[in-house]
Amino acid sequence: MKIAVLMGGPSSEREISLKSGSAVAAALSGLGHQVITIDLNREVVARLKNFAPDVVFNALHGKPGEDGSVQGLLEVLGLPYTGSRVLASAITMDKIMTKRVLLQAGIPTPKFLAWTGAEYATGKKEIKAAILKELGLPVVIKAPTQGSTIGTFIVREEGELEPAIAGALKYDLSFMAEAYLAGPEITAAVLGNRKPQVLPLIEIVSHTGFYDYQAKYTPGLSDHIIPPRLPDDVLAAATSLAGRTYALLGCRGFARVDFIVAGGREPQVIEVNSVPGMTATSLVPDAARAAGLDFPDLVQKIVDLALEP
């Protein structure tokens, strides 16, 4: 099979995407496929037309590869591709929209507030007061369309609030403030289309105190514990919520649903990643291995799902 792996691109997660794409390409080549890697740039359409792949493996993290833009391009070109379609990609890339959909459906997610940069510029005092009154401290400030915790800040003192908001607005035109919940962080990898399978849950323990970009991608700075050290009923609830969230948002192929387990008892969805990392330290490959799928088998399964009608 001829497979083009899209990777790199202009996003803040470029380096991770290059690692994911390289790992995927190596696995596919090892399975006997004819594979090329394409760094997303203005030549992408010409290269895709010239190679004429049977399927495109999207290993792009962040915009424009994860927000529906590249998905729309591939739809126009008539090329099958891995992962979620345009609408699901656009919604899951935007944490604000994701949370609004989750709340409408009654899926638990931490309380949040959101503003545009323009609103903040003319109402800083009122907005900061609203955050402190409604959410208190500590509070999490996020750039809503970034991944890998880029543009995410935990604010523990009032004086840190304004710099955190400014930091988030460096990446996006809006920002969100989210209630800080104390509890274990767990994640659920989900695989499938019409009948998605939730893979074994993983508890994430960061040795830096916060599962940030460095902790995610530096070997030895975090532990992935399977199964999480939580009661069976809590794990069952998280598994059910992961499947519901995946279906609600219209995800396809594979995705990752991240949770904070408030007080060690109440799983709450914090975000959904529609193009999860596929590097040596990534969570989805770890979950797949726990389910009996080695990395090449996982990659092949994702390709097979892309070709399903």
Swiss-Prot record:
Binding locations of Mg(2+) 1: 258, 271
Annotated residues for binding of ATP: 132-187
Predominant cellular place of this UniProt entry's protein: cytoplasm
Enzyme Commission identifier(s): 6.3.2.4
ATP-grasp domain segment(s): 99-304
Subcellular localization: Cytoplasm
GO BP term (any one): cell wall organization
Pfam families with a match to the protein in the record: Dala_Dala_lig_C, Dala_Dala_lig_N
Cofactor binding note of this UniProt entry: Binds 2 magnesium or manganese ions per subunit.
One GO cellular component, as annotated: cytoplasm
Obligatory cofactor(s): Mg(2+); Mn(2+)
Catalysed reaction equations from the record: 2 D-alanine + ATP = D-alanyl-D-alanine + ADP + phosphate + H(+)
Similarity remark: Belongs to the D-alanine--D-alanine ligase family.
Name of this chain's protein: D-alanine--D-alanine ligase
The organism of origin for this protein: Moorella thermoacetica (strain ATCC 39073 / JCM 9320)
